[in-house]
Amino acid sequence: MHFKATLLSLSIAATLPSFSLSAAPLHIDTALPDAAQIQQSNSWLEISLGQFQSNIEQFKSHMNANTKICAIMKADAYGNGIRGLMPTIIAQGIPCVGVASNAEARAVRESGFKGELIRVRSASLSEMSSALDLNIEELIGTHQQALDLAELAKQSGKTLKVHIALNDGGMGRNGIDMTTEAGKKEAVSIATQPSLSVVGIMTHFPNYNADEVRAKLAQFKESSTWLMQQANLKREEITLHVANSYTALNVPEAQLDMVRPGGVLFGDLPTNPEYPSIVSFKTRVSSLHHLPKDSTVGYDSTFTTSRDSVLANLPVGYSDGYPRKMGNKAEVLINGQRAKVVGVTSMNTTVVDVTEIKGVLPGQEVVLFGQQQKQSIAVSEMENNAELIFPELYTLWGTSNPRFYVK
């Protein structure tokens, strides 16, 4: 599936002038296929650069003047493709980007980004070692990590920038527990390691609950102030940051020195629907089939036609990120109308009932998620039918399908 994404997304700019492109995988093939290969795409994503820009601008309008924005581009920009979106990030003057993997960091740097690059999860020593040339600011939450990175810094002859993670937000995955004397001692030891330069202190909140955030924010402020005093860190040299998309917008006092928006930029923040999704998931009709009443459809014969029916075969299945559980529940859009998925979704095929839809022909566009004419398939609809949260869907889409970037 990566092969498919590489071929199509590399060639789209040469054949469709209204699109710009970036390859879906981070390690891409430079060979350009012919136009016929583009037409062989069974499913694809359309990413709206205009909506991405609009979401960024709207988000920026709610930030304090002195609050820096660090755009979180982990999971290859939430499945939307780092390489395709970085030109917009740069044009918008975003000073910081957050990533998870070295491949993502390299894609950011190769886009021409010269700003601050932060890893937003704990990394192994081998990851950190192989990323020294990328100038990543690492997230440190244990004494051992600090020792390992300090030794790496010494060997490389560099002073490495780090952000200390505290567990005051209650996430329990990266940070130091500051409620114990042992935890406080560990934090001071990290902050005073030679060859490491502490440039930030952070935490992360696990819930969409403003009152809970405010209570934990107070604890973070107390912990970070204590740590800076004990480790002789200068306040003006430390970036304090705790706010993800939800917190930045709904608890403005938590914006502090920097915010870390992720989902909101891509249109995935359930509490703030005023930020539309930038992605659509599409396929096309591959064939039409006329079945008589009482015909069964799909594996396990879970659907039986109640009338003479016209069924459309769609060349997309769970291997492309359209889950098996969509069967007999979900709907898709064809000719601006809803068509019910019948039978369970197969690995590479989905069947929909188009008996009541006029003018359906092979090759016509089908919207699996997104809008078509006056109809739309919403996030909540996808989640309910798939029995998955939306990020589990779109991150899989991004690894399984070519991306077309629409102005």
From Swiss-Prot:
Protein source organism: Vibrio cholerae serotype O1 (strain ATCC 39315 / El Tor Inaba N16961)
Swiss-Prot/TrEMBL catalytic activity: an L-alpha-amino acid = a D-alpha-amino acid; L-lysine = D-lysine; L-arginine = D-arginine; L-alanine = D-alanine
NCBIfam families assigned to the protein according to its UniProt record, in alphabetical order: alr, PRK13340.1-4
One cellular-component annotation, GO: cytosol
UniProt GO BP: D-alanine biosynthetic process
Annotated consequence of substituting G169A: Completely abolishes or highly reduces the catalytic activity towards all the amino acids except Gln and Arg
Signal peptide segment: 1-23
Modified residues (N6-(pyridoxal phosphate)lysine): K74
Enzyme class label: isomerase
Biotechnology: The substrate range of BsrV, which includes activity towards non-natural substrates (e.g. ornithine, norleucine, homoserine, N-acetyl lysine methyl ester, diaminobutyrate and aminobutyrate), is broader than any other known amino-acid racemase and suggests that it has great potential for biotechnological and industrial applications. Currently, production of DAA is an expensive process that is typically reliant upon inefficient chemical catalysts.
Name listed for the protein in its UniProt record: Broad specificity amino-acid racemase
Outcome of swapping P391N: Completely abolishes the catalytic activity towards Ala, Ser and large aliphatic side chains, while activity towards basic amino acids is preserved
Higher taxonomy: Bacteria, Pseudomonadati, Pseudomonadota, Gammaproteobacteria, Vibrionales
Similarity-based family: Belongs to the alanine racemase family. Bsr subfamily.
A Pfam family matched in the record: Ala_racemase_N
Cystine bridges: C70-C96
